[in-house]
Amino acid sequence: MGEVKAEQGARFIAPFNGPVEIGLRALAVLNDAYPDAYSLQRLVVFDYLIVHSDDIPGGPPGLHPQTPHRGTELLVRRGVLQEGLLLYQSRALVEQCYEETGVFFAATERSAAFLDVLRTEYVVGLRQRAAWLVGSFGTISDADLEKMVRDHVGEWGAEFAMESVLWAEETQ
């Protein structure tokens, strides 16, 4: 699940956090929110939260392992997410909605059927977290979502900094 790269005539698919995987995560969120549409910025934040749901008190275990300084992931997801949305849009699984306040993305009537045939452990966990995410944050305002991110982004992944300090003290 990731970006396809040509390498000396061969095709290589980067398995993690490429357009295919990030687009699939966005599709799961949009499907759970259907028929509501979300902005790209909201989807960037939601992608972070679905991957690192354990950063939210009371959230389910994260879809991916925790990494140091993971809060910075928010800065690099936008472009890849756009590519993923375009990929799924080209298959009529996501649609762009143009409104007075901007461009939004929504699932289509085909999205649920597509997701239903994907039965891997990863997709099952993804869909569970998408339901939790939309249920917990789907209706909060963009301003409140942005405030939550600003208030906590410095904490997300910071536990590794403390862990490395403690480990350094033990070895001395």
Task: Give the label of every model feature segment.
Residues 89-99:
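A short, conserved structural fragment
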Residues 143-147:
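Non-catalytic interaction/clamp surfaces of large macromolecular machines
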Residues 74-90:
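Short amphipathic alpha-helical interaction segments
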Residues 101-108:
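Minor-groove-contacting beta-hairpin "wing" of winged helix-turn-helix DNA-binding domains
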